[in-house]
A protein has these predicted regions:
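Catalytic Walker B motif of ABC-type/P-loop ATPase nucleotide-binding domains
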Residues: 63-67
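Helical segment within the ABC ATPase nucleotide-binding domain
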Residues: 78-90
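Conserved ABC ATPase signature
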Residues: 38-42, 46
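Conserved catalytic motifs of ABC-family nucleotide-binding domains
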Residues: 59
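Short, glycine/charged-rich "phosphate-handling" switch motifs in NTP-dependent
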Residues: 110, 122
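ABC ATPase C-loop
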Residues: 55-56
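Single conserved hydrophobic/aromatic residue that forms the stacking wall/gate
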Residues: 1-6, 10
Length: 145
């Protein structure tokens, strides 16, 4: 029978799980500080970190993130995207759905711009970040400064 990634986590040796937890705490030191708290008492940013950390415990080859910056303070958004960039560098493939185009394009290798559910543009993230249509519509005048 096929087993899920979640059940595979529990079949692993405690030492391996501890090492994975140390890696997650290395990415999210704030979770280490809050390890005795229940998830319901964490801030929105801490909950986002917890969700990503839980997913990483399963050693995924693909990590899907849907609007990781939604509702978070700008400082926490920067922290989350710095971690996404670090994860990308480890070889984990990340499928990121994000309305914050500037932050998404800074950490992406390739991007897709959707308009009413259809792909309007796609290409290397750096190319999209410099595309006048993307700048005018999604990045605004600040990108031109």
């Amino acid at each position: 029978s096929r087993s899920s990634a979640a059940s595979d986590v529990y079949k692993r040796q405690p030492r391996a799980i501890g090492a994975d937890l140390d890696e997650v705490y290395g990415l999210f030191p704030r979770l280490l500080e809050r390890r005795r708290q229940t998830a319901g008492t964490l801030s929105g940013g801490e909950r986002q970190m917890l969700a990503i950390g839980r997913a990483l415990m399963g050693k995924p080859s693909l990590l899907m993130l849907d609007e990781p910056s939604l509702g978070l303070a700008p400082l926490i958004v920067r922290e989350i995207f710095a971690i996404i960039d670090r994860l990308r560098a480890t070889g984990v493939t990340i499928l990121l759905v994000e309305q914050n185009a500037r932050a998404a394009l800074e950490v992406a290798d390739h991007g897709y711009v959707l308009e009413t559910g259809d792909i309007a543009l796609h290409g290397p993230a750096r190319q999209l970040a410099g595309d006048p249509r993307v700048i005018d519509t999604y990045l605004g005048a600040m990108a031109q400064a």
